[in-house]
Regions:
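Amphipathic, hydrophobic secondary-structure cores in small proteins
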Residues: 44-58
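DNA major-groove recognition helix of helix-turn-helix/homeodomain DNA-binding modules
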Residues: 55-70
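Short alpha-helical DNA-recognition segment
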Residues: 25-44
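Residue-level detection of the helix-turn-helix DNA-binding "recognition helix"
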Residues: 22, 36, 47-49, 76
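A short, Lys/Arg-rich alpha-helix, primarily the initiator
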Residues: 1-24
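Short, charged recognition helix plus adjacent turn
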Residues: 1-8, 44, 72-79
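Residue-level signal for the short linker/turn that defines the boundary of a DNA-recognition helix
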Residues: 15, 26, 52-55
Length: 79
């Protein structure tokens, strides 16, 4: 996969993570407390600056009560 497409995908995942947090009425501090990840790491994912690995994705989805497909851009919209 070309680097440009990979970066764009990470940004889309980050945008969806941010929207899922808003929908769950959860800020970075709360999500960090539930998952054990730092607020800085969560921000890096939101901004698309860090790759989100499957184990991290599952933990975030569990805390946010969303399906992984919602963050992985497999749906057109986050409902």
């Amino acid at each position: 996969m070309p680097r440009e497409n990979h970066v764009a995908k990470q940004r889309r995942i980050g945008e969806r993570l941010s929207r899922a947090m808003v929908k769950a009425h959860m800020d970075r501090k709360e999500l960090a407390a539930l998952t054990g990840y730092s607020e800085t790491q969560i921000l890096s994912w939101e901004l698309g600056r860090a790759e989100l690995y499957p184990t991290e994705l599952i933990k975030l989805c569990h805390a946010l009560d969303v399906m992984p497909e919602c963050l992985l851009c497999w749906e057109r919209r986050l409902h």
